[in-house]
Amino acid sequence: MLITAVLFDEIQHSKPGESLPFIAHSGLVKTHGPAQISVSELIHQNRLPANPTQEEITWARNHFLDPEMNITLLAAKFQRLKLALGLPESLMLQASRSYLDAKAIATLTYLHNGKLDYPARVLGYMQDPELHGLIYDGRQPNPVITV
């Protein structure tokens, strides 16, 4: 639910045209894709060297434009931050389960975005019944169609 809530917020605040390749490669925006990931995150994840070449930066920006890769990088970022905070790798955080989980989620979201109002918004989205409905109630089997 954390990744869904972060994506929900990031998509609402996305900049017009930032998903276009020429904008991504122009250098006008530092974060890219639905998860708003930057080149520095790839360095933290050891997917790029500390001083990437222009070719490596271009490769990274191309990957940021792929939504599936972008969301995978967000999940890896949260996993990396969890380990840096000393949280167990296999721990699934649930804000409704405990105050400590909610605090850990707030810390992770702050470290992702860096804005003080961000954790409260994300925690709110994680409790949003409509967002829960989209994820958990919207799964319906495909109808059988006979022709």
For each of these PLM feature ranges, what is it?
Residues 1-146:
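Catalytic glycan-binding domains that act on GlcNAc-containing polysaccharides
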